[in-house]
A protein has these predicted regions:
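Thiamine diphosphate
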Residues: 1-109
Length: 109
């Protein structure tokens, strides 16, 4: 998600400089989901435009805020990766959404 990406975001610079073609998809849910009730200090992260940061570093960046735009954004990003570029797709998601299909879906840190 966006919290984890924020801790390592400058690795996009490393990938661009070393021409490591990679596609990064970020779940931009605006905070740490370990606190879905938003009670803990520091939970809120805002909705950082990491796609713009990626562009500033020389990567391809896309921002998605509607479900119907996810597939086209991923397809365009993959074309950029196929050309040897780094691509970041920043997908705004609902912080309350949790994957219920995984055995550890209820796990929170």
């Amino acid at each position: 998600g966006d919290g984890s990406f924020g801790l390592n975001a400058m690795e996009i610079d490393t990938a661009v400089r070393h021409k490591i073609a990679v596609l990064v998809v970020i779940s931009l849910n605006g905070g740490w989901t370990a606190d879905p009730d938003k009670n803990k200090p520091g939970r809120e992260l805002g909705y950082t435009r990491y796609d713009k940061m990626a562009e500033a570093l020389g990567a391809y960046g896309a921002y998605v805020d509607k479900p119907e735009d996810i597939r086209p954004a991923l397809e365009k990003a993959q074309k950029e990766v196929d050309k040897g570029r780094v691509a970041v797709v920043n997908v705004r998601t609902d912080y309350r959404a949790r994957a219920g299909t995984l055995a550890f879906a209820s796990y929170s840190t």
